[in-house]
């Protein structure tokens, strides 16, 4: 897709023209077509619930499962749909029986609720939670692999890490990390919250046991889209967080790993079914996937790179700011993060960006100091990044 077409693509997004949106890493806006699709499904659900749920949903659900599986290089028969990464990871964490004494290994920069999740597992099972330090501004993915491998040992029962680190946008070498863990008999759980739509994701090349992803960020799918992709043979280890109608498959459902009449498989549906609820976001996911396919995923990634390079050039020459995201395309994508000067109040800065300048950007306390993360996507403009730079100067007195 030519650069000149990005303005047209921006016009196809639901964007508030008064807001500079630099926070796709927390939640992406919807393409208008995806909004119309999910709204249409909800209108049918509201008007005639049983017709929609019993007669329309099964085919739509299987279509969504297949579409998402193709995008991520997965198997639809091993792809459980979920609300988000948090739900998917907690499903795994609440199900696995890890041998004690032993250890759960994490990187030192994981999403806080996920760290809490594994801390709870460690307490319940009598395990130790250990972290390894991610290299600062690595120039080669092998540096990350070496740091993780050095922390693995005979007591390591499970290794959890983010494919893309939320704080900095650092991309971890997921395939290599999972290969090293598997060679040592260590179960792997990967937090892929940022990966769908952000990376050229191919789960067939990542030998992980459990891979969780979200759709409401870079995939630009409706809020409420997540997934859990399972390695062969791991489904039987999982128990649903809620017992509902799919807990015992109805007579004639067929094998646990075969497509059923509900748009799932008996094994997957057991994990997915939470009673009557709104799964319209799942059903609308193909629209978001098709939208980005039309623009060209490679072109989108290249455009993000142009925008983050512009942000790097613009923000580099400011005293007190420390770059936290590597420059290598192997290690970074559409996000770039900076450590802000000591004494900066993260909450006040974020409030000032929004209230004075209508800029949405992630600013958070992250010891040893606050971090600003810029998430640029194809609908971002260079002028918007210029506005951020000017706003930062105004708010920090530079």
From Swiss-Prot:
EC number: 5.1.1.17
GO biological process, one term: antibiotic biosynthetic process
Pathway(s) this gene product operates in, as recorded in its UniProt entry: Antibiotic biosynthesis; cephalosporin C biosynthesis
Keyword vocabulary terms for this entry: Antibiotic biosynthesis, Isomerase, Pyridoxal phosphate
Cofactor requirements of the protein: pyridoxal 5'-phosphate
Catalytic reaction equation(s): isopenicillin N = penicillin N
EC category name: isomerase
Gene Ontology molecular function: isopenicillin-N epimerase activity
Modified residues (N6-(pyridoxal phosphate)lysine): 217
Pfam families: Aminotran_5
Family: Belongs to the class-V pyridoxal-phosphate-dependent aminotransferase family.
Protein role: Catalyzes the reversible isomerization between isopenicillin N and penicillin N.
Protein name: Isopenicillin N epimerase
Source organism of the structure: Streptomyces clavuligerus
